[in-house]
UniProtKB/Swiss-Prot annotation:
The keyword Ribosomal protein is annotated on this UniProt entry: yes
Protein name per Swiss-Prot or TrEMBL: Large ribosomal subunit protein uL23
Annotated SUPFAM superfamilies: Ribosomal proteins S24e, L23 and L15e (SSF54189)
One example GO MF annotation: rRNA binding
Gene Ontology CC: ribonucleoprotein complex; ribosome
PANTHER family: 60S RIBOSOMAL PROTEIN L23A
Phylogenetic lineage: Bacteria, Bacillati, Actinomycetota, Actinomycetes, Micrococcales
Example GO biological process: translation
Pfam families, per the entry: Ribosomal_L23 (PF00276)
Subunit-structure text: Part of the 50S ribosomal subunit. Contacts protein L29, and trigger factor when it is bound to the ribosome.
InterPro entries cross-referenced by the UniProt entry: Nucleotide-bd_a/b_plait_sf (IPR012677), Ribosomal_uL23-like (IPR013025), Ribosomal_uL23/eL15/eS24_sf (IPR012678), Ribosomal_uL23_CS (IPR001014)
Annotated function: One of the early assembly proteins it binds 23S rRNA. One of the proteins that surrounds the polypeptide exit tunnel on the outside of the ribosome. Forms the main docking site for trigger factor binding to the ribosome.
Organism name: Leifsonia xyli subsp. xyli (strain CTCB07)
Keywords of this entry: Ribonucleoprotein, Ribosomal protein, RNA-binding, rRNA-binding
Family: Belongs to the universal ribosomal protein uL23 family.
Length: 99
């Protein structure tokens, strides 16, 4: 079960600003960077409480950080988790609502 005592702003880190995520907005789908330890239920509750919208579904994907060469050998970017949130109705203005 989801931890209800988590702050929603600790679950949702930032909206993803990319060409692909903008294309999904027309379908009512919004993409967010989320805490890698959070589950779909926590993400749904966080989106509903922050933006005051009704969520239909949440799809998540884990992205592995790339390995990069540095002056000191190999380094690795951190792993990230993204959530694609589909709304039942309404929309989110991601440029003014977050902050």
């Amino acid at each position: 079960m989801a931890a209800v005592n988590k702050d929603p702003r600790d679950v949702i880190i930032a909206p993803v600003v990319s060409e692909k995520s903008y294309g999904l907005i027309d379908e009512g789908k919004y993409t967010f960077l989320v805490d890698p330890r959070s589950n779909k239920t926590e993400i749904k509750l966080a989106i509903e409480s922050i933006f005051r919208v009704e969520v239909a579904s949440v799809n998540t994907l884990n992205r592995q950080g790339k390995t990069r060469r540095t002056k000191f050998g190999l380094g690795k970017r951190k792993d990230t988790k993204r959530a694609i949130v589909t709304l039942k109705s309404g929309s989110i203005d991601i440029f003014t609502a977050v902050g």
